[in-house]
Amino acid sequence: MPSNSVLHLALFVPWESFLSNMQGDITKIWSGYENTLSNRLRFYVSNISLLRKSAEDARRDAKLWASRSEGDDTIDMDIPLDEGDYGQEPATMAEHHQYYTALLQTLQNAVHDSDATRGSPVLQGLIQDLHQENPVEEGRSFVQRHDDFYQQIRCDQNGSLYGFPSLSGDDIQAVVKAQGMLHLRMLDEIESGLPNNTYGTGNGNTEDMLTGFNDAEIPFPRQGQNLVTAQTQVPRIFVDVGPETAFVELGRLAASKKTLNNLQNMALQLVCRFLDKYTADPESAGQHFQYTGGQAGTGKSRVVDALKDVFIERGQPHLLQITGTSGSAAAQIGGTTVHSACGLDTRRSSNQPLSFSEGKKWMWKQKLVLIIDEVSMLGGATLYEISRHLQSLRDCPDKPFGGIPVVLLMGDFYQFAPVLETSLLVNKLLESSLSSVGQAAISHHRGYSLWQMFKTVVILEEQIRARGDPELRDLLDRVRNGVQTHQDLQLLNTKVIDRSQITFRNGLRAITPLNRNRWSLNMEAVVDWARFNKRHISIFISAHTWRNGTLSLEEIARTIDQGDDSSCKVPGVLFYAQGMPVVVNTNIYTGLKIVNGAEFTAVDIIPDPKHPGYHLADDVTIHFGPPLGILTQSRETEGLNVPGLPTGTILICPASHTLDPRHPHFKFLSTKCSRRGLPVVPAFALTDYKAQGKTFAEVLLELRGNHMSDSQPSKCDFTSLNIQLSRCTTLQGIKLLSPVRSIDFIDNKLDKRMLDAMERLQDLAAETKRRYEG
């Protein structure tokens, strides 16, 4: 834009260098000078380029962002642009003392009342340090850290942002906008299967790609329009030239490359055989519905990877659609959520007509294979909605799933079931009379009927995760079959570890279904890990804005003490140390795999000047408000190049959540409260749900239920028992936080309906194997 070029010339180039130049285009003049700027000036230029988006553009981006919501794991953050003070007055020193007292109360509760951290020497040591440096009873003012404190910390700890210009609020806005646009571009690439060669995670053109993103629609060829004359700003159509290799042959090569075992190879070849049949004669081939299951650690994702290689070798990755029922499941296999891919909208009535863009419909009509992973979380009603949407997307209302040639469901029904729906394995109509059936039951039954069409079944059996430990492998088999013994119980109880021996210094992870125990364990773990590794500890109290009324110290303390859970993604207090593992609590950037349950390393923090740090101990600083953001990285972000950030990192910013007295967890509140903080927490301790799909060398387990009854944990859920025990690679690596009760282990198995359904799947798997081998 010419006005931008004038502005850039005026700001970054000596005027005498260009005022005499009366010829040529102003943009070309600026481009010539831009290439000569220093890296520091180019950093500011890129931020200004990103910030030039108008408010109207931002609203358009927000609408597009909303259209990418992920079903049950919806993006529950607004576009995180830090545009003001959120209506908060600066906190007084008296309020600081209230929150500090509340923090101490939380720590003392963990030491005295929590089964998980009772008597923790690590937390007792921290409490002692805080009392020594800042006695509550004296009420003296906190000593504020100097302005360059975190720069010094970065220097001492080799922080990722050391040497980078300090990021202002405007810089944060630019980074967030860049990440949001990159997320949408990546999501388009994942959903379409077409690699966009105009940018790459490690390429220097990322800034140009981001600056121009969303400035125009990408037209798709309409019915009757010649593909050659279709005008597109970005090339989105690939033409395959040369002979195609058969799917079966490429499947053999992929299986050899991935070293698939016999059952994995069968799962792959069943799909490849059908695809060869379909490409030879689409009209007579029909459709192929396949379920590939198996317990955790049997290598289901390797089948997906091999099938992905087959399509890549054919030059047709865009014909394969990979999805998961949750953001984390999708991210683990390189896909997107099925809600996003199929345009599922939890707010749309089933009676409303479906409407999709011609571009999205055109994309879906090309697809040969749809993969849906983590099928245990897929309810019957959602499966029916997927089929209904695909019928509309593919303009094929008379065939299941819109006539897509292959639908491949993956997952383990011994893992967690749908939260708000009923498992595909359950026929609800058997449990109620037809006269009393509601719309939800009807939708589920339609999905259940679709599920009954999946008669090609492969159950993977070879335990890859625990194959080096036959004793653990046999134990897991007995647990899945519900025949675990008292001898197994005695064996597990030899794994109980004394409280004084629990340390998180060397990579130990904990899994507990009880949120309160998780909060306490994570506080202990951060302090233990940070002090052992000589890392500074920063404590961020989330900002709380009360609607009205005078609050007691007890009410403030209970609010701070209530951490994150499934209904509140923001913790009351965040303990941070550079290099610690963190887990994300909500879907933020699905295209960049920043999703609910995804794990990252926290490599730096950007404090908010409005919430300065105060000295609590030589290695402990407290902030009475959230930071501007936390900088994270993982293997998934390697090579990612966001303007303004170190290569390979992504910034996560604060989110807001309303605490409502009507919610069971916040009944103690006298009025509503808005909490603002980071939607991430330390990942030393995880819930059983977020541990699903992860593997650890050493793990501390709590085989209990997920709520308290009469001051005792409820019975351990079978799914939790199965998932926790199968997270480790060896029996030696398993440690127990507390003894396993008989009620938690003996006769703990799936209910009869599920067992009967699993028996049917085993029969279908045997029949499938006979057909395949015959």
Residue ranges and their predicted role:
Residues 229-774:
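RecA-like helicase/translocase P-loop NTPase motor core
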